[in-house]
Amino acid sequence: MRIAHLGHAELRTPKLEDSVDFFKNVLGLEETERTGHSVYMRAWGDWEHHTLILTEADRPGLEHVGWRVGAPEDVEAFAKEIEARGETVTHVEAGTEKGQGDAIRFTYPGGQMMELYYDVDKFQPGDKRSRLKNAPQKPPYRGLERCS
């Protein structure tokens, strides 16, 4: 039972389009999907469907942090361990969060919501596919034009 890596964060924002513009045009993330009041974005080097979720809300804040676990069975193993510590665990069905399989959510003692998941949709680069096998896509050369 182990955590593989930090997967994503979901931020609440009262200024959804301004936030999307900032993450896209200043920090270089790209939009992967929109659903309801949420926009899914990813950093160019991320292999997963999204790195960041921006969700429209009345107040800004952190909705949750997602951690990918090392194996499918780790999700339930962590659920049992967290419940044994007296914490409440909520099971999240596959597809509730775009690009992600079954997950659990809980509030850790510091007060923020955490999410653990294993199954995730991989980024599909299409025409942005890199020739390098260790890169999910070609680098986004923002502000530069390619010379022929």
Can you say where each PLM-predicted feature lies in the sequence?
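Short amphipathic alpha-helices within nucleic acid-binding modules
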Residues: 73-80
